[in-house]
């Protein structure tokens, strides 16, 4: 994690107000996603055999990176050590983006970006795209703790302030609901598969099987079972020191469903319910999300 470590050390010396900047109305990390990095993304050439992983922040991205790497290794018979940097394209400096062209397939590329801000070839080249969503109440709680543990991002002043910013979309990578509505438009695209964090927590073996089939990476039942066993959240936390070094505790906290109940006031819960229903009621994504089960 040496590159990430040096970036975090740079950020630790910065004032909180300098850690984010606004681009086209959306906040991004000054250290991880400077303008030249996002500018260069316009030239990134996806391939049809790329594996693309997308998630709004704190919806299970790092968990699914680990699962996908295990699926790739098991299916291809390789045992590759994961690279030191997370596969988020918006974190890759321009020189690294250019080196990506030389990477052998299958390449695992990830992003927290809104679909409108992704490299155009993510859609024109028709690679398979896995999108992970999580209920908004647990997402905002996880995001709040992440802000307070990650030196690259400014500290959240308070839970109430961060909740308010999340509700208006004034957080890094933009509005959760804007992301959700953008993927709702693509929910029937055969190259897009949307999975729910809560469903994966409920039945990880089934999730591993569906994901491997979607990416045409066949696994035996034994491999599915083994990958699921190694990828429970508790196993990931245990292994996080090895996989993420000192940053393991930043990326993996509780991973629970329902932790929002320890943070939300009754008024905040009602406010989120109203916003959720005004934005997503009647959508196909809402039908998958099972909001009433996980957020009441």
From Swiss-Prot:
One of its GO terms (biological process) is cellular response to xenobiotic stimulus. One of its GO terms (molecular function) is sulfotransferase activity. This is Sulfotransferase 6B1. 3'-phosphoadenylyl sulfate binds at residues 134, 142, 197, 253-255. Sulfotransferase that utilizes 3'-phospho-5'-adenylyl sulfate (PAPS) as sulfonate donor to catalyze the sulfate conjugation of a variety of xenobiotic and endogenous compounds, including dopamine, T3 (triiodo-L-thyronine), T4 (thyroxine), flavonoids, isoflavonoids, and other phenolic compounds. Its EC number is 2.8.2.-, 2.8.2.n2. Strongly inhibited by the divalent metal cations Fe(2+), Hg(2+), Co(2+), Zn(2+), Cu(2+) and Cd(2+). It catalyses: thyroxine + 3'-phosphoadenylyl sulfate = thyroxine sulfate + adenosine 3',5'-bisphosphate + H(+). Optimum pH is 7-9. Keywords: Cytoplasm, Transferase. It holds the Pfam family Sulfotransfer_1. Thermostable between 20-43 degrees Celsius. Gene3D superfamilies: P-loop containing nucleotide triphosphate hydrolases (3.40.50.300). Its main location: cytoplasm.
């Amino acid at each position: 994690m040496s590159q990430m470590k040096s970036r975090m050390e740079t950020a630790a010396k910065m004032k909180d107000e300098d850690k984010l900047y606004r681009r086209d109305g959306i906040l991004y990390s000054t250290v991880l996603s400077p303008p030249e990095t996002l500018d260069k993304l316009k030239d990134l050439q996806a391939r049809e055999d790329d594996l693309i992983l997308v998630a709004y922040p704190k919806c299970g991205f790092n968990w699914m990176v680990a699962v996908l790497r295990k699926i790739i290794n098991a299916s291809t018979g390789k045992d590759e050590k994961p690279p030191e940097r997370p596969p988020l394209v918006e974190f890759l400096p321009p020189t690294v983006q250019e080196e990506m062209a030389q990477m052998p397939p299958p390449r695992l590329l990830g992003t927290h970006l809104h679909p409108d801000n992704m490299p155009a070839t993510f859609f024109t080249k028709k690679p398979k795209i896995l999108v992970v969503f999580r209920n908004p109440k647990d997402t905002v709680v996880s995001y709040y703790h992440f802000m307070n543990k990650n030196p690259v991002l400014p500290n959240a002043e308070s839970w109430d302030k961060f909740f308010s910013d999340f509700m208006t979309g004034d957080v890094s990578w933009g509005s959760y609901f804007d992301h959700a509505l953008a993927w709702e438009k693509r929910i029937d695209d055969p190259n897009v598969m949307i999975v729910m964090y809560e469903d994966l927590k409920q039945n990880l073996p089934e999730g591993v099987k569906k994901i491997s089939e979607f990416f045409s990476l066949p696994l035996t039942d034994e491999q599915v079972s083994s990958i699921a066993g190694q990828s429970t959240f508790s196993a990931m936390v245990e292994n996080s020191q090895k996989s993420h070094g000192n940053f393991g505790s930043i990326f993996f906290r509780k991973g629970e469903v329902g932790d929002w109940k320890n943070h939300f006031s009754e008024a905040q819960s009602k406010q989120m319910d109203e916003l959720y229903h005004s934005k997503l009621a009647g959508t196909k994504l809402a039908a998958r999300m099972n909001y009433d089960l996980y957020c009441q």
